[in-house]
């Protein structure tokens, strides 16, 4: 969408950057000068206690002296709401009382589609929640009771239940006047190849709304109650609203909690996030049925400098952690990394918290390992280096790993740390 000359300048002039930013931060009034529009606060983009985030209201720019985030009011809305440029402009234009320039027919059609799909998704959230509260949801309520999730927690996360019926949601939505094609486009129903009546995608499942950073339901995750179900967990397909590789479960509340100093945690699934949040670890997120992607990593780093990935300490958990390490290495920048909190084997966060309490989970987080430790473990554990050839093979593998780090300074520091670990393994006399 093209914007006419002067529109963005007019938009920026109508809005106070401190007013927009002030909804996301707590100003340090001792350090700030309100009269001059010179404001300071703890940064909303990374975890800190000091006020290193500076807003110059007169110039209309912000800059963080800690993580180096910078930009204007549009950039701020883009980053804090996790939206694109045009959507950020639309948000601010509504606030400023400025009509958006006329869209092309195609742009208007896409915007109307997204708006309509959000309405369908929110109607589905309400339907699923009613089903959980009714007779059909008895088994689902029992499961949630066994998992220790009380009514307040269910309300907080909007959890519902999809009845074990092919057309329960379909009949409800079409009966309420929703266009059949919209239900299919939202990923809530599947249209048969033979042209018959579409049927509900989610059946006999506990339903977890997946919301974007602005709190809008854009997808669902469903947990099967039937132990013999083909898929224990089922996510919405990708739609005009939902790109699973660019979204994280619980992203909105987690971003807010991380901005208040809570450690940003990356768990494996919905129930892990909910268990962590209910235990007071409010800045918890999870990927959506896939391994962590580059886009998700960049999103995590916009929230915190060093997110902690919490995984099972068994072999599968270690393999998953190493896949994240391999993905992250080429993307690393100074000050941006990951740590890994490996839980006791066979335990997920919910198991650990219920068995040993919140303090046990906190100890696991406090012992989180840096990426280089996992790399070293992968290359050395279970190996015997009793010959020059085996040691040379290790050196070759480590050089290959180091070459994937693009940042020269980080590559040098990783090399120094690996050299230190190598000396500890082989003795100071080795070269």
Residue ranges and their predicted role:
Residues 1-108, 163-164, 170, 420:
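N-terminal structured subdomain of primase-like DNA metabolism proteins
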Residues 3, 15, 21, 34, ...:
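Phosphate-handling DNA/RNA-contact segment within nucleic-acid enzymes
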Residues 9, 13, 79-96, 204-224, ...:
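Structured, non-catalytic alpha/beta "coupling" segments that mediate domain-domain communication
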Residues 11-14, 33-36, 107-118, 134-138, ...:
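Conserved phosphate/pyrophosphate-binding and hydrolysis machinery centered on Walker-type P-loop NTPases
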Residues 20, 72-76, 123-127, 139-143, ...:
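A general alpha-helix detector
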Residues 43, 64, 77, 144, ...:
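Terminal peptide-recognition signature
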Residues 87-142:
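Conserved active-site segments centered on acidic
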Residues 212-213, 255-264, 291-307, 311-431:
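A charged alpha-helical hairpin associated with nucleic-acid processing machineries
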